[in-house]
Amino acid sequence: MANYCSNSVRFIGNENSVDAVRKLFDDIDKKQMRSNRYHMPDFVKGGMGYMQDIAVGPSWISYETRMVPNLEVLDDIADHYGVDYIAWYQEPMAGLYGEAVRTAGETQWVNIDTYTQKGRGNNPAFFDLKELQASLLIGQHPER
């Protein structure tokens, strides 16, 4: 499939909730492999529910989507389990790179346009996002 968007996400919150999210992604992957169809849980209402090549690790979950990240799906999952997240995504063929943070029910993101280099550098939104990411990771164990 052309125009994959590679996504990596780290969910942050209560350890049991984060473990439940990791199990959810494992379950999605297993259901998709068994049925050869895409699957999303019923509580996911936003965005495109397309994910493939899901890899669940101790700290990060990685997967592919079509062309763009599916932040709305991540929002629904985070809200359902009461966790926050930090996400990175890239679609090199379209020059799309970005980062997102969801905390306290709000998602902030910065897309980086590689063709004009807009979005990074002196962009205050990018630096604000990096500070928000750092504040979420304070006190987190490296394996989480």
Pin down the residues of each PLM region.
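Intrinsic low-complexity, intrinsically disordered or marginally ordered coil/linker segments
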Residues: 1-144
